[in-house]
UniProtKB/Swiss-Prot annotation:
Classification via PANTHER family: MITOCHONDRIAL PEPTIDE METHIONINE SULFOXIDE REDUCTASE
Listed Pfam families: PMSR
Known role: Has an important function as a repair enzyme for proteins that have been inactivated by oxidation. Catalyzes the reversible oxidation-reduction of methionine sulfoxide in proteins to methionine.
UniProt xrefs under InterPro entries: Met_Sox_Rdtase_MsrA_dom, Met_Sox_Rdtase_MsrA_sf, MsrA_MetSO_reductase
One record GO biological process: protein modification process
Database matches in Gene3D superfamilies: Peptide methionine sulphoxide reductase MsrA (3.30.1060.10)
Protein name: Peptide methionine sulfoxide reductase MsrA
Alphabetized GO MF terms: L-methionine-(S)-S-oxide reductase activity; peptide-methionine (S)-S-oxide reductase activity
GO cellular component term, pick one: cytoplasm
Organism from which the protein derives: Clostridium botulinum (strain Hall / ATCC 3502 / NCTC 13319 / Type A)
Enzyme Commission number, as recorded: 1.8.4.11
Protein family membership: Belongs to the MsrA Met sulfoxide reductase family.
Catalytic activity: L-methionyl-[protein] + [thioredoxin]-disulfide + H2O = L-methionyl-(S)-S-oxide-[protein] + [thioredoxin]-dithiol; [thioredoxin]-disulfide + L-methionine + H2O = L-methionine (S)-S-oxide + [thioredoxin]-dithiol
Catalytic machinery residues: 10
Length: 157
């Protein structure tokens, strides 16, 4: 099994979208690459912790490759917008690809390069090693499964 953490705006929609993909075996939402240990949702939303709302993904590489997974990720975000996705604004809504395995970096860089060909503006999606990931509060986990019709900036149909 492989792991990656993806930030694409509000984590509810990213998790719901990713959980529907064949080969994804586990998803969790949380806060990635900030400066405060174990922050609360309110602290992250204040913008002072530096965390991104993100989705931890465990996937079966024999069913879906990282390249395929990233292609699906690119399709649900606007990678040219800084600190904003849909109606959500703030540093916690930035886009990012946070890797746990250094061997994945070449695939990520190649994928970002290929995606850039679709845009005139530069892609601002961060590509960094995962420094930290704190699981979000339980009520955020599988939020759109628990609350069908809840807010989502991603078209899930």
């Amino acid at each position: 099994m492989k792991e990656i953490v993806l930030a694409g705006g509000c984590f509810w929609g990213v998790e719901e979208y990713m959980s529907r993909i064949e080969g994804i075996v586990e998803t969790k939402v949380g806060y990635a690459n900030g400066i405060k240990e174990n922050p609360s949702y309110e602290e992250v939303c204040s913008g002072v912790t530096g965390h991104a709302e993100a989705c931890y993904i465990k996937y079966d590489e024999s069913i879906i490759s990282l390249e395929e997974l990233l292609n699906k990720f690119w399709s649900i975000i606007d990678p040219t917008v800084l600190n904003k996705q849909g109606n959500d604004r703030g540093t916690q809504y930035r886009t990012g690809i946070f890797y746990l395995d250094e061997k994945d970096l070449n695939v990520i860089i190649k994928s970002k390069y290929q995606e850039q060909k679709n845009y005139r503006k530069p892609i601002v999606t961060e590509v960094e090693p995962l420094k930290c990931f704190y699981e979000a509060e339980e009520y955020h986990q599988k939020y759109l499964k628990k609350n069908p019709g809840g807010y989502c900036h991603i078209h899930l149909d």
